[in-house]
Amino acid sequence: MLQVYLVRHGETQWNAERRIQGQSDSPLTAKGEQQAMQVATRAKELGITHIISSDLGRTRRTAEIIAQACGCDIIFDSRLRELNMGVLETRNIDSLTEEEENWRRQLVNGTVDGRIPEGESMQELSDRVNAALESCRDLPQGSRPLLVSHGIALGCLVSTILGLPAWAERRLRLRNCSISRVDYQESLWLASGWVVETAGDISHLDAPALDELQR
């Protein structure tokens, strides 16, 4: 059975400021660095063999801290990037016009083909993050990979494994540096393929962490 761990990046400056990041970037805060060190300690205990990360700066930094603890190299995969939020990237949520807020809410409330202008649809996001996960099946037998990605991206991935459409209402809370686990297995009692073992574990963190809807 292949076990794949999923980690959201540490808290960033724009998370704390409630600004929309998408594929734009801001650095980890001091708290985010601490969260990454705490998840790194947990990852070392899990026997991680490979670290595969989104190539955006906030995930790169989180992955670097984890890799140092685990003694692993990092593979960067752009398919693990966050949802492209188009014209709303870098904007403070509280500054959005009514029309702009409606664009953003489409992605939260489950609108088929919802899309921010110049951004991605949830289906496009789902296609690429699921392809990145599927690539883990090509790793050597006995591998235990850890993927470092983003809140909406990982939420979409876990939700689609559970059988929900990519655009379904967002009802999964994945806080900064939370750990989820998905397994690929053949089972008599569960559907064969990917199954969700855990989602959003923050027991390794010593302080409250932000979820995507609190940014």
Swiss-Prot record:
SMART domains (UniProt xref): PGAM
A Pfam family hit: His_Phos_1
GO MF, one annotated term: phosphatase activity
Keyword Isomerase (UniProt): yes
Claim: Isomerase is one of the keywords in the record: yes
GO cellular component, one term: cytoplasm
Site (Transition state stabilizer): residue numbering on this chain: H150
Enzyme nomenclature, EC number: 5.4.2.-
Superkingdom of the source species: Bacteria
Annotated active site: H9 (tele-phosphohistidine intermediate), E82 (proton donor/acceptor)
Residues the entry annotates as binding substrate: 8-15, 21-22, 58, 60, 82-85, 104-105, 151-152
GO biological process assignments: glycolytic process
Catalytic activity: (2R)-2-phosphoglycerate = (2R)-3-phosphoglycerate
Keywords: Glycolysis, Isomerase
Pathway assigned to this chain's UniProt record: Carbohydrate degradation; glycolysis; pyruvate from D-glyceraldehyde 3-phosphate: step 3/5
CDD domains: HP_PGM_like
Family: Belongs to the phosphoglycerate mutase family. GpmB subfamily.
Protein name stated in the entry: Probable phosphoglycerate mutase GpmB
Gene giving rise to this polypeptide: gpmB
